[in-house]
Amino acid sequence: MSEFFHISVLLRECLDGLDIKPDGIYVDGTLGGAGHSSQIAKRLTTGRLIGIDRDPIALKAAGERLKPFENNVTLVHSNFCEIAQVLQDLNVSGVDGILLDLGVSSPQLDDAARGFSYMMDAPLDMRMNSQDTLDAYQVVNTWSQEELRRILYTYGEERYAPQIAAAICRRRAEKPIETTLQLVDVIRSAMPPAALREKQHPAKRSFQAIRIAVNDELGSVEKVMRDAIPLLNPGGRLAIITFHSLEDRIVKLGMAEAAKGCTCPPSFPVCVCGKKPKVKLISRKPIVASDEELEANPRSRSAKLRVCEKL
């Protein structure tokens, strides 16, 4: 279990946001090291926790941590975006809370062999699920220059995307780019000296972009925003932690759309559109880490929690 130790971000805020009932049914769609889940399970008596993770290593570690609660816990190896299918397979028609902690976890970042980190040398991989076929090596060495430019700009918000994409294509024409530090070297070579002196690591945005592409992270968030709310019982809550603006935008817009009621013009004497809000927002603004948490866990700095409740 020590191989997958992960400090849970916004733990107290998530538990408050989910408003856990001892007899409720809850889903942790991004189980990880079960930091959030172990605290949810601790609060259940006759309730049930369904834990989902696409990473088999995380799932195994979570199983160990959740052993004291095994009578109340069901673990499933799947992607959180398949939550509707998972619940259907388990004959669960509705749940009282869904928690998603998006992005890559600390153990995945810290395990050099996984290829997520630009600080340690490893084969280009970046798969959250090692059984998936697409990896970072394929993206870097086989995708077209235009495809690379697009993901670097769109997913990494990298201003030097055209230069980096061109540099990758030039280097791989000589020989394949096989490791993380080889890729870092290519990225550095494409950036002007001023950019290399910035506080942020020059490869951070590019690595984020490639990781998002490999794991279809934004597609998964878009799908779960369509599917999760209908799965909630009335009064059930959806709590989602994001770590970058692209994910947060999808979650923010998805919740705002679900919270919208009548869209008729103010001049209409009665509603003719028939639209009713599906949820209410628990907080208009995202919940962020406290100063104490930031000091204890600097990785929580970019975390944003949004919560809504099914009407």
Language-model-derived ranges and their functions:
Residues 1-311:
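S-adenosyl-L-methionine-dependent methyltransferase catalytic core, i.e., the SAM/SAH-binding region
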